[in-house]
């Protein structure tokens, strides 16, 4: 029921994206990567999911060398480059990556994982930091004062890249990917029996 409400109520057909609603019913103009979260919970129809993908590579919204900005690149808030206004957040990228994988968008998920890894490594190699958030234009972490240079969720950026090679989930077990055929070990056993 909730997924249906999300699909029917928050889908903005004219823009081809999920968006928040104003109190009077209209769609909020500003967008963020949370527009992709309906993929995570399985609320997007196949047609909606396909249209969402267009925004991942669109450099006026979420696309670019450093992704995913927390305000679209064409939003005036993006230029602020302050906290949730245009910065890249590792936890948000991770959630979008999970949603892409859930819908079988493996190429798009792999691209996001690679870009996220590159963003992390740029700052790790240059400054040995694992930052709270990042500039969506330059990829820099410490270009403004309210960013913590060491924050645990920074590890989600390379975790996505690792998940493209070796993955574990409670329901299906281990999956090891390579250039050949995937190796799957599972289902997993727990003290209560097999996990399904």
Locate the predicted segments by residue.
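Non-catalytic terminal regions with compositionally biased, polar/charged low complexity
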Residues: 195-196
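C-terminal capping/lid segments that line or modulate ligand- or cofactor-binding pockets
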Residues: 14-60, 76, 82-190
